Amino acid sequence: MDNLKEEETNEINYIIDQLQKLNKKFKIYTVQRFKEEEPFNKYISESVSKKTRLLIHGTRCSSVIPILQTGLKIRPSTSVHFSGKVYGEGNYFSEHVQKSLNYTGWDNDQILLIYEVHVGNEYIYEGWYNGDRGIKLNYNELLQNGYNSTYVKAGNGLQNSEIISYNEDQSKIKYIIHITK
């Protein structure tokens, strides 16, 4: 992790700080899926806004190997545990460790996947969160209006913000955080 850009260093340090405040024991591993590099770079090069962020994706341990083999899928196969799509079909991320830990299950080991996500021009949603009856955002409509992702702001019934990307080429894995109890 020595060759990080300053912004990426700040983001990973923020994640580490959150883990430490939760008194979590963890190890961070650097990961690179070469199959993600070219599509990710192409997606960014074709976008007006080049903005990316390091974001967290919580998943059960049983889903890690399939995700590493095939990448993070918007509609995963049945071999991967899949939960929620309150804001439409997409890959869901958070900037909050606690939010992402809620998706890791209750095993003694927990896994957080850290992705570089092209957020580009973000659609900011500040509406009321009403559980499974949430709004279904349409990626094609968002794209036609110049948006690349959705940032759902915390508040109005939602405790932590969420970021949704709608194209599998919008993200690439950078780190795996293994948490032990």
UniProtKB/Swiss-Prot annotation:
GO terms for biological process: double-strand break repair; protein poly-ADP-ribosylation. PROSITE patterns: PARP_CATALYTIC. The keyword NAD applies. InterPro entries: ARTD/PARP, Poly(ADP-ribose)pol_cat_dom. One of its GO terms (molecular function) is NAD+-protein mono-ADP-ribosyltransferase activity. It catalyses: NAD(+) + (ADP-D-ribosyl)n-acceptor = nicotinamide + (ADP-D-ribosyl)n+1-acceptor + H(+). Residues 1-181 form the PARP catalytic domain. PANTHER family: DNA LIGASE, POLY [ADP-RIBOSE] POLYMERASE 2. This is Putative poly [ADP-ribose] polymerase-like 100L. The lineage of its organism: Viruses, Varidnaviria, Bamfordvirae, Nucleocytoviricota, Megaviricetes.
